[in-house]
Amino acid sequence: MTTIHATAIVDSQAQLDSSVTVGPYSLIGPNVKVGAGTTIGPHCVIEGHTTIGRDNRIFQFSSLGAIPQDKKYAGEPCELVIGDRNTIREFCTFNIGSPGDLGVTRVGDDNWLMAYVHLAHDCVVGNKTIFANNSQLAGHVHVGDWAILGGFTVVHQFVKIGAHSMTALCTVLLADLPPFVMCQGQPAQARSMNYEGLRRRGFSPERIAVVKAMHKALYRESLTLQLARERIADLVKNSPESLPDVEMMLLFLEQTSPQRGIVR
């Protein structure tokens, strides 16, 4: 049976699995769905068309599913969708999507989101990411799998953050951050590649060598972006094992907005 504290207010139309726990003084709206094993701490507000998967842990004072901070929003039925096994720490704020995009803010699985993280409307977060305290995403930001955002990182709207990338403390990200790249600064500048993270995730020395070569092509040879892409594409010839990594980088660079560009 669902465990709901006597002081919590859960709308009768909300759909909570029988194993969900809701802490004191939390408010759950009518269009909320919560999967098995999820724990909702005290003083949380979950509203809007919000779907939360299995085995998530939501800490006190989090606000999930509020309307977007967008003056154009006029009450359209947009959504927040959160996957499984996420940790959402104190005072996090995740807004629903907006009709100006796909109408969905989405969080994947196995993410670690520390206190005061903000996900604005239409953000898309992959799997196994880490957001340190007070990381702030403006609208329409996309974050790839395994990315790590340092504390107080702020991200401009529409920016894309590639898989396995990393930002340092207090980074201001105004341009797209390619996969594997570590950056720092206000505004951000590329510093290196996330080699230690790749080793911890089981990347072979051969794959890491190709990542180093991609870094050299992008940042050490003064090449145009087009020439760097051609150089990166050639790396597969000597390392078929690295094909997924090279393809991911090339696709990211191809999809980068000319107006936004990449971190240099």
Swiss-Prot record:
Top-level class of the enzyme under EC nomenclature: transferase
Subunit architecture: Homotrimer.
GO CC terms, sorted: cytoplasm; membrane
Family (UniProt): Belongs to the transferase hexapeptide repeat family. LpxA subfamily.
Protein role: Involved in the biosynthesis of lipid A, a phosphorylated glycolipid that anchors the lipopolysaccharide to the outer membrane of the cell.
Protein name: Acyl-[acyl-carrier-protein]--UDP-N-acetylglucosamine O-acyltransferase
CDD domains on file: LbH_UDP-GlcNAc_AT (cd03351)
GO BP terms, alphabetized: lipid A biosynthetic process
Annotated source species: Albidiferax ferrireducens (strain ATCC BAA-621 / DSM 15236 / T118)
UniProt-annotated location(s): Cytoplasm
Reaction(s) catalysed by this chain's protein: a (3R)-hydroxyacyl-[ACP] + UDP-N-acetyl-alpha-D-glucosamine = a UDP-3-O-[(3R)-3-hydroxyacyl]-N-acetyl-alpha-D-glucosamine + holo-[ACP]
NCBIfam families tied to this protein: lipid_A_lpxA, PRK05289.1
Any one GO molecular function term: acyl-[acyl-carrier-protein]-UDP-N-acetylglucosamine O-acyltransferase activity
Keywords linked to the UniProt accession: Acyltransferase, Cytoplasm, Lipid A biosynthesis, Lipid biosynthesis, Lipid metabolism, Repeat, Transferase
Source taxonomy: Bacteria, Pseudomonadati, Pseudomonadota, Betaproteobacteria, Burkholderiales
Biochemical pathway: Glycolipid biosynthesis; lipid IV(A) biosynthesis; lipid IV(A) from (3R)-3-hydroxytetradecanoyl-[acyl-carrier-protein] and UDP-N-acetyl-alpha-D-glucosamine: step 1/6
Enzyme Commission number(s): 2.3.1.129
Presence of the UniProt keyword Transferase in the record: yes
